[in-house]
Amino acid sequence: MKFSDFSVLGLGALALNAVTVSANTADTALLRTYSTISPSLSEIESAASATEVAEVVSDVEGAAFKRFFIIFLENTDYDKAAGDESLSWLAEQGITLTNYWALTHPSEPNYLASVGGDYFALDDDRFISMPSNVSNIVDLLDTKGISWAEYQEHSPYAGFQGMNFSNQETYASDYVRKHNPLILFDNVVNNDTRLANIKNFEDFNNDVENEKLPQYAFITPNMTNDGHDTTIQFAGKWSKDFLAPLLENDYFMEDTLVLLTFDENETYGIKNKVFSILLGGVIPDELKGTKDDTFYDHYSQLASVEANWDLPHLGRHDGDANVLEIVANATNITNVEVDTTYMINETYIGYLNDYNIELPAPNVTAINRNGQPILDSIKETWEDEYSKQVSESYYTSTTTTVSADVTDAETFSNFYRYRQC
């Protein structure tokens, strides 16, 4: 498909309605606010004793892999991560992605976008909840019965919705909601079956031991192990200690692809490229220790899942994102070269930082990289609103990567073509 298939508006609408701004300039009085869930310890303990944990498995064939596990580390500049001894060891076991980009700052919008195809102008880490008419990767996976889960280290129980859960001995920050992407969606938390798939690391260990792993999983270490409250050396060592035994586990490795990446870089004033590695049993020996220079970003996670299992799309930035090369090669998809000259960290005024702005409608007419239309249920929900927004020239791009200093119209419009939906 052409990327212009995902573009709904022209440069004029951009100039009128999509002024990019620095993250700290949004008017806090206009922020959409939500009631924070902060249960007491006794309430948490009571809920934990009554919570059921899902064990859902499936065996759906994929073009390049049968299982895809994503692990997010935290807040590290590319060069620092690339220079870490433990991460360098892991890189020798797989493929280093030298041109993989986070989307914005701070953490939470990157997590949100990785499963939802958009971060809806979120520019902080506050408590949010996306309404039930906003879909995510789970809706796509469910169309083919592809099992999925999240594994959140030290979450007190499956489906915990609280803002955080501290270490009960040291009271240090431990589990945090902002690093749990699927818990941010009402169509997950209001569905008990889905909620039971939001598990913790004890459940992960059990699922490995019992050979009950899902086919898709998002894995988040706690605030110590992911490097947020420690160092890249600490996070790198944790990553090696966590992954090295799994790389020797025949059950885990079979037909599995692992993406180890970072939510964002640390230094906001430089480009938001993050160190990333592909690992797993689907990596052929001849590619171990190699590098892939293709442009990817967090939306490539969604695009790769869609292409691997030939799924429909969400109508957001999943539809035009580059696909991981191991999947692209298996599906005859040609990735595009992306000019990263103006990839800097800017945000924009939109749904989550201005309550006067409507939710951007997904593009219900587009075709994704693997030739599939939008998910039928999304089209049914959003078709009228999409037509309305297009007729009103409502701009729906969520790019954060265009320099605010760019004034050349041709450069500006060509860059935005890649990131309009």
From Swiss-Prot:
The active site is at D229 (proton donor). It catalyses: a phosphate monoester + H2O = an alcohol + phosphate. Its EC number is 3.1.3.2. Keywords: Hydrolase. GO terms for molecular function: acid phosphatase activity. The keyword 4Fe-4S does not apply. One of its GO terms (biological process) is phospholipid catabolic process. InterPro entries: Alkaline_phosphatase_core_sf (IPR017850), Phosphoesterase (IPR007312). The keyword Transmembrane does not apply. PANTHER family: ACID PHOSPHATASE PHOA (AFU_ORTHOLOGUE AFUA_1G03570), NON-SPECIFIC PHOSPHOLIPASE C4-RELATED. This is Probable acid phosphatase. It comes from Kluyveromyces lactis (strain ATCC 8585 / CBS 2359 / DSM 70799 / NBRC 1267 / NRRL Y-1140 / WM37).
